[in-house]
UniProtKB/Swiss-Prot annotation:
Membrane-spanning intervals of the chain: 18-38, 74-94, 100-120, 158-180, 197-217
Gene: mt:ATPase6
Gene3D superfamilies: ATP synthase, F0 complex, subunit A
Superkingdom, natural source: Eukaryota
Pfam families attached to this UniProt entry: ATP-synt_A
The protein's assembly and partners: F-type ATPases have 2 components, CF(1) - the catalytic core - and CF(0) - the membrane proton channel. CF(1) has five subunits: alpha(3), beta(3), gamma(1), delta(1), epsilon(1). CF(0) has three main subunits: a, b and c.
Coiled coil ranges: none
GO biological process, one term: proton motive force-driven ATP synthesis
Keyword line: ATP synthesis, CF(0), Hydrogen ion transport, Ion transport, Membrane, Mitochondrion, Mitochondrion inner membrane, Transmembrane, Transmembrane helix, Transport
Record has Zinc as a keyword: no
PROSITE patterns given in the database record: ATPASE_A
One cellular-component annotation, GO: proton-transporting ATP synthase complex
Source organism of the structure: Anopheles gambiae
Record-given protein name: ATP synthase subunit a
């Protein structure tokens, strides 16, 4: 049972000893170029409005010290994560964002680059962040330790939050899907089906929210080092 339950997270599809499941990470790239040679439809108009809204919000979070075009990185990050979250809801498509391999690969380099930029170019500003304003002198050494630890675990919390949310929803859907064939009557089967549809809608919302949270927190971490 446990093997079947977690088999959806196992990248085991191979051809010539090459794992193919991770190629699903780039499936979203095949959907984007189509908009450049087709007439705009409602989906493209909505998507462009979403990107413009995100650009304005990220620009506000970065403040006047943000470089021109810096929001493009965070919008691309949001798009990549959201595409992978949504594609993982389709049958037989591997959910790459349910693995720390991908989420840590996104979170750690971003955090490390922000820290290197901040400590090299704004050293005094970074030291000032270690002691919140109004801290009593007696508590300053403890606050430095606490702030340092909270700063170091940021990439881990970013990665684990996204991974845990993706795993939890998929496990619930898998559990309900496995109990469907064992349903004794149509009433229980219809109840399971209704619950699965509700969970699928909820997972769609989680896919958007978690990609938005990941991008917004990355933007906030970037704004702190300026």
């Amino acid at each position: 049972m446990m093997t079947n339950l977690f088999s959806v997270f196992d990248p085991s599809t191979t051809i010539l000893n090459l794992s193919l499941n991770w190629l699903s990470t780039f499936l979203g790239l095949f959907l984007i170029p189509v908009s450049y040679w087709l007439m705009p439809n409602r989906f493209q108009v909505i998507w462009n409005n979403i990107l413009l809204t995100l650009h304005k919000e990220f620009k506000t979070l970065l403040g006047p010290s943000g470089h021109n075009g810096s929001t493009l990185m965070f919008i691309s990050l949001f798009s990549l994560i959201m595409f992978n979250n949504f594609l993982g809801l389709f049958p037989y498509i591997f959910t790459s964002t349910s693995h720390l391999t991908l989420t840590l690969a996104l979170a750690f380099p971003l955090w490390l680059s922000f820290m290197l930029y901040g400590w090299i170019n704004h050293t005094q500003h970074m030291f000032a962040h270690l002691v919140p304003q109004g801290t009593p002198p007696v508590l300053m050494p403890f606050m430095v330790c606490i702030e340092t630890i909270s700063n170091v675990i940021r990439p881990g919390t970013l990665a684990v939050r996204l991974t845990a949310n993706m795993i939890a929803g998929h496990l619930l859907l898998t559990l309900l899907g496995n109990t469907g064939p064992m349903a004794s009557n149509y009433l229980i089967l219809s109840l399971i089906l209704t619950t699965q549809i509700a969970l699928l809608v909820l997972e769609s919302a989680v896919a958007i929210i978690q990609s938005y949270v990941f991008a917004v927190l990355s933007t906030l971490y970037s704004s702190e080092v300026n």
